Amino acid sequence: GECGVFDITDPQCRFAYLMRRAAEREEDFVGRMYRELGERFSGRELETMLATAAAYYEAGGSVTKAAEALHVHKNTLQYRMRRLWEAVCPGVGGSFEREFLLRLCILYHRQLRLRTPLI
């Protein structure tokens, strides 16, 4: 769910709180990583790729559920995710690291679109 007020003591908001804190503290790093994604994927493609990742993580990592939500084939979703993972963590990084870094890029992208501060 969405959290209006971010508080680490609220179990419903803990992850969102930590993501925002990390994004705020490491804004230069996240911005650099986001720009590198932008160099690899065109504007519209970057939008599609990040929407794919967001749907995948919102579906709890279920390829089937995310593919259904996006109205794409499961193989398409897996292909996009592999391309994103390789762009964010080329040759290294476990699933947690890939998810964390991609979620930071998704958050950064959404903040750019909304033109609002990270916190």
Q: What are these model-derived regions, one by one?
A:
Residues 1-119:
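Cytosolic nucleotide-utilizing catalytic cores of signal-transduction proteins
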